[in-house]
Swiss-Prot record:
A GO molecular-function descriptor: isomerase activity
Domain of life: Eukaryota
Keywords on record: Endoplasmic reticulum, Isomerase, Lipid biosynthesis, Lipid metabolism, Membrane, Steroid biosynthesis, Steroid metabolism, Sterol biosynthesis, Sterol metabolism, Transmembrane, Transmembrane helix
Family: Belongs to the ERG2 family.
Disordered: region residues: 1-31
Pathway(s) per entry: Steroid metabolism; ergosterol biosynthesis; ergosterol from zymosterol: step 2/5
Signal sequence segment: none
Protein name: C-8 sterol isomerase
Enzyme Commission (EC) number: 5.-.-.-
Pfam families (alphabetical): ERG2_Sigma1R
Biased composition (Low complexity): 7-30
Lipid biosynthesis keyword on record: yes
Protein backbone atom coordinates (compact mmCIF):
# COMPACT_ATOMS: atom_id res chain seq x y z
CA UNK A 1 0.00 0.00 0.00
CA UNK A 2 1.59 3.32 -1.11
CA UNK A 3 2.45 5.79 1.66
CA UNK A 4 0.07 8.66 2.24
CA UNK A 5 1.19 12.02 0.95
CA UNK A 6 1.71 14.66 3.58
CA UNK A 7 -0.69 17.53 3.46
CA UNK A 8 0.83 20.64 1.90
CA UNK A 9 -0.99 22.78 4.44
CA UNK A 10 1.35 21.62 7.19
CA UNK A 11 4.39 22.83 5.28
CA UNK A 12 2.84 26.22 4.76
CA UNK A 13 2.27 26.93 8.44
CA UNK A 14 5.75 28.27 9.26
CA UNK A 15 5.58 30.56 6.24
CA UNK A 16 2.20 31.90 7.30
CA UNK A 17 3.39 32.35 10.88
CA UNK A 18 6.48 34.31 9.74
CA UNK A 19 4.39 36.53 7.53
CA UNK A 20 2.00 37.24 10.38
CA UNK A 21 4.93 38.02 12.73
CA UNK A 22 6.42 40.38 10.14
CA UNK A 23 3.13 42.22 9.75
CA UNK A 24 2.82 42.49 13.55
CA UNK A 25 6.37 43.84 13.92
CA UNK A 26 5.80 46.32 11.10
CA UNK A 27 2.56 47.49 12.72
CA UNK A 28 4.25 47.98 16.11
CA UNK A 29 7.05 49.95 14.48
CA UNK A 30 4.54 52.21 12.72
CA UNK A 31 2.61 52.80 15.93
CA UNK A 32 5.84 53.62 17.82
CA UNK A 33 6.95 56.01 15.08
CA UNK A 34 3.54 57.66 15.11
CA UNK A 35 3.67 58.10 18.89
CA UNK A 36 7.14 59.66 18.65
CA UNK A 37 5.97 62.10 15.99
CA UNK A 38 2.94 63.01 18.09
CA UNK A 39 5.14 63.50 21.18
CA UNK A 40 7.59 65.76 19.32
CA UNK A 41 4.71 67.64 17.76
CA UNK A 42 3.16 68.14 21.19
CA UNK A 43 6.38 69.56 22.62
CA UNK A 44 6.86 71.86 19.63
CA UNK A 45 3.32 73.13 20.05
CA UNK A 46 3.90 73.71 23.78
CA UNK A 47 7.08 75.71 23.18
CA UNK A 48 5.42 77.70 20.39
CA UNK A 49 2.57 78.68 22.73
CA UNK A 50 5.01 79.45 25.55
CA UNK A 51 7.10 81.65 23.26
CA UNK A 52 3.99 83.45 22.00
CA UNK A 53 3.01 84.23 25.60
CA UNK A 54 6.46 85.17 26.92
CA UNK A 55 7.85 87.14 23.95
CA UNK A 56 5.46 90.14 24.23
CA UNK A 57 6.02 90.34 28.01
CA UNK A 58 9.81 90.18 27.55
CA UNK A 59 9.63 92.89 24.88
CA UNK A 60 7.64 95.25 27.11
CA UNK A 61 9.99 94.65 30.06
CA UNK A 62 13.03 95.19 27.83
CA UNK A 63 11.68 98.60 26.80
CA UNK A 64 11.28 99.54 30.48
CA UNK A 65 14.60 98.11 31.64
CA UNK A 66 16.14 101.50 32.47
CA UNK A 67 13.29 102.31 34.85
CA UNK A 68 14.20 99.34 37.09
CA UNK A 69 17.74 100.50 37.86
CA UNK A 70 18.63 102.15 41.19
CA UNK A 71 22.40 102.39 40.69
CA UNK A 72 24.08 104.97 38.47
CA UNK A 73 27.20 103.99 36.50
CA UNK A 74 28.78 107.45 36.71
CA UNK A 75 28.24 107.63 40.47
CA UNK A 76 29.78 104.18 40.99
CA UNK A 77 32.83 105.18 38.96
CA UNK A 78 33.22 108.43 40.88
CA UNK A 79 32.68 106.63 44.20
CA UNK A 80 35.34 104.05 43.34
CA UNK A 81 37.89 106.74 42.47
CA UNK A 82 37.20 108.67 45.67
CA UNK A 83 37.52 105.50 47.76
CA UNK A 84 40.88 104.72 46.11
CA UNK A 85 42.05 108.29 46.62
CA UNK A 86 41.13 108.11 50.31
CA UNK A 87 42.61 104.68 51.09
CA UNK A 88 45.20 103.78 48.45
CA UNK A 89 45.88 100.03 48.44
CA UNK A 90 43.88 99.28 51.59
CA UNK A 91 41.17 97.16 49.95
CA UNK A 92 39.23 96.55 53.15
CA UNK A 93 38.99 100.30 53.84
CA UNK A 94 38.01 100.97 50.21
CA UNK A 95 35.16 98.46 50.41
CA UNK A 96 33.90 99.98 53.67
CA UNK A 97 34.05 103.48 52.16
CA UNK A 98 31.94 102.34 49.19
CA UNK A 99 29.32 100.48 51.24
CA UNK A 100 29.03 103.31 53.77
CA UNK A 101 28.30 105.85 51.04
CA UNK A 102 25.77 103.59 49.35
CA UNK A 103 23.99 103.31 52.70
CA UNK A 104 23.73 107.11 52.83
CA UNK A 105 22.45 107.49 49.26
CA UNK A 106 18.72 108.10 48.75
CA UNK A 107 17.02 105.48 46.61
CA UNK A 108 19.87 103.02 47.09
CA UNK A 109 20.20 102.44 50.84
CA UNK A 110 17.13 100.14 51.20
CA UNK A 111 18.63 97.69 48.70
CA UNK A 112 22.14 97.36 50.14
CA UNK A 113 23.28 94.16 51.87
CA UNK A 114 25.45 95.21 54.82
CA UNK A 115 26.39 91.66 55.84
CA UNK A 116 29.88 91.19 54.42
CA UNK A 117 29.37 87.54 53.46
CA UNK A 118 32.33 86.40 51.38
CA UNK A 119 32.03 83.25 49.27
CA UNK A 120 34.25 81.60 46.68
CA UNK A 121 33.21 82.11 43.07
CA UNK A 122 34.20 79.80 40.21
CA UNK A 123 33.06 80.88 36.77
CA UNK A 124 34.53 80.63 33.29
CA UNK A 125 37.60 78.87 34.62
CA UNK A 126 38.51 81.75 36.94
CA UNK A 127 38.40 81.57 40.72
CA UNK A 128 38.07 84.33 43.28
CA UNK A 129 35.79 85.44 46.07
CA UNK A 130 32.85 87.82 46.17
CA UNK A 131 30.75 89.86 48.56
CA UNK A 132 27.22 90.48 47.27
CA UNK A 133 26.24 94.08 48.02
CA UNK A 134 23.07 93.93 45.93
CA UNK A 135 21.23 91.35 43.84
CA UNK A 136 17.93 91.76 42.03
CA UNK A 137 16.32 90.70 38.75
CA UNK A 138 17.89 93.58 36.78
CA UNK A 139 21.04 94.52 38.73
CA UNK A 140 23.81 93.14 40.87
CA UNK A 141 26.66 94.87 42.66
CA UNK A 142 29.49 92.84 44.16
CA UNK A 143 33.07 93.10 45.31
CA UNK A 144 34.99 90.45 43.36
CA UNK A 145 38.65 89.59 43.50
CA UNK A 146 41.51 87.43 44.67
CA UNK A 147 44.74 87.97 46.56
CA UNK A 148 46.75 85.54 44.38
CA UNK A 149 45.60 86.15 40.79
CA UNK A 150 43.28 84.33 38.38
CA UNK A 151 42.36 84.07 34.70
CA UNK A 152 39.33 82.97 32.72
CA UNK A 153 36.47 83.52 30.31
CA UNK A 154 34.18 86.50 30.94
CA UNK A 155 31.07 84.66 29.78
CA UNK A 156 28.57 86.02 27.26
CA UNK A 157 25.86 87.71 29.28
CA UNK A 158 22.38 89.23 29.10
CA UNK A 159 23.60 92.29 31.01
CA UNK A 160 26.25 95.01 30.67
CA UNK A 161 29.07 94.39 33.11
CA UNK A 162 31.20 97.17 34.62
CA UNK A 163 34.43 96.22 36.43
CA UNK A 164 35.58 99.17 38.55
CA UNK A 165 39.15 98.22 39.43
CA UNK A 166 39.91 99.09 43.07
CA UNK A 167 43.34 97.54 43.67
CA UNK A 168 45.68 95.64 41.37
CA UNK A 169 45.42 95.43 37.59
CA UNK A 170 43.12 93.55 35.25
CA UNK A 171 43.99 92.74 31.64
CA UNK A 172 41.68 91.55 28.87
CA UNK A 173 42.06 90.11 25.39
CA UNK A 174 39.86 90.13 22.28
CA UNK A 175 40.56 87.81 19.30
CA UNK A 176 42.34 89.63 16.48
CA UNK A 177 44.18 92.06 18.74
CA UNK A 178 47.91 91.80 19.42
CA UNK A 179 48.04 93.82 22.63
CA UNK A 180 46.09 93.38 25.87
CA UNK A 181 43.60 95.84 27.28
CA UNK A 182 44.99 97.08 30.60
CA UNK A 183 42.81 98.33 33.46
CA UNK A 184 44.63 99.88 36.45
CA UNK A 185 43.02 101.08 39.72
CA UNK A 186 40.37 103.73 39.11
CA UNK A 187 39.55 102.53 35.58
CA UNK A 188 36.41 100.76 34.36
CA UNK A 189 36.37 97.64 32.22
CA UNK A 190 32.98 97.68 30.47
CA UNK A 191 31.99 94.31 29.03
CA UNK A 192 29.15 95.16 26.66
CA UNK A 193 26.08 92.94 26.84
CA UNK A 194 26.41 89.94 24.53
CA UNK A 195 30.19 90.29 24.01
CA UNK A 196 32.98 88.11 25.35
CA UNK A 197 36.66 88.39 26.31
CA UNK A 198 39.47 86.54 28.00
CA UNK A 199 40.46 88.30 31.21
CA UNK A 200 43.22 88.04 33.76
CA UNK A 201 44.11 89.37 37.19
CA UNK A 202 47.87 88.62 37.20
CA UNK A 203 48.29 89.18 40.93
CA UNK A 204 46.17 90.50 43.79
CA UNK A 205 43.23 92.42 42.32
CA UNK A 206 39.81 93.48 43.58
CA UNK A 207 36.99 95.22 41.75
CA UNK A 208 33.56 96.68 42.33
CA UNK A 209 31.58 94.76 39.72
CA UNK A 210 28.23 96.15 38.59
CA UNK A 211 25.90 94.40 36.14
CA UNK A 212 22.69 95.83 34.72
CA UNK A 213 20.31 93.93 32.45
CA UNK A 214 18.73 90.51 32.94
CA UNK A 215 20.53 88.87 35.86
CA UNK A 216 18.85 85.41 36.28
CA UNK A 217 20.24 84.00 32.99
CA UNK A 218 23.74 84.87 34.23
CA UNK A 219 23.35 82.43 37.11
CA UNK A 220 23.89 79.45 34.77
CA UNK A 221 27.40 80.76 34.05
CA UNK A 222 28.00 81.03 37.78
CA UNK A 223 26.86 77.44 38.41
CA UNK A 224 28.51 75.68 35.45
CA UNK A 225 32.01 75.29 36.90
CA UNK A 226 30.67 73.81 40.13
CA UNK A 227 28.42 71.31 38.36
CA UNK A 228 31.04 70.25 35.80
CA UNK A 229 34.31 70.59 37.68
CA UNK A 230 34.76 71.71 41.29
CA UNK A 231 31.71 69.93 42.77
CA UNK A 232 31.92 72.39 45.67
CA UNK A 233 28.24 72.10 46.55
CA UNK A 234 28.45 73.72 50.02
CA UNK A 235 29.75 76.92 48.39
CA UNK A 236 27.16 76.67 45.63
CA UNK A 237 24.42 76.28 48.24
CA UNK A 238 25.63 79.27 50.27
CA UNK A 239 25.90 81.42 47.13
CA UNK A 240 22.38 80.41 46.08
CA UNK A 241 20.96 81.19 49.53
CA UNK A 242 22.52 84.67 49.64
CA UNK A 243 21.58 85.50 46.04
CA UNK A 244 18.03 84.16 46.40
CA UNK A 245 17.53 85.91 49.71
CA UNK A 246 18.62 89.27 48.28
CA UNK A 247 16.58 88.91 45.08
CA UNK A 248 13.41 87.95 46.94
CA UNK A 249 13.96 90.63 49.58
CA UNK A 250 14.32 93.29 46.90
CA UNK A 251 11.28 92.04 45.01
CA UNK A 252 9.24 92.38 48.21
CA UNK A 253 10.48 95.98 48.43
CA UNK A 254 9.27 96.61 44.89
CA UNK A 255 12.73 96.44 43.30
CA UNK A 256 12.58 94.39 40.10
Amino acid sequence: MPPKKQSSSGGNKPSGSGSSSGRSSSGSSCRCSCRCRCSIGGWLKFFAILFALVAPIAYVLEQRLESFYVFDTEHLHDLSKRAISAHGNDTKAIVKYIVDELNDRNGVAPYVNNDEEWVFNNAGGAMGAMYIIHASITEYLIIFGTAIGTEGHTGRHTADDYFHILTGTQTAYVPGEYEPEVYPPGSVHHLVRGTVKQYRMPESCFALEYARGWIPPMLFFGYADTLSSTLDFPTLWRTSVITGREMISNLLKGKF
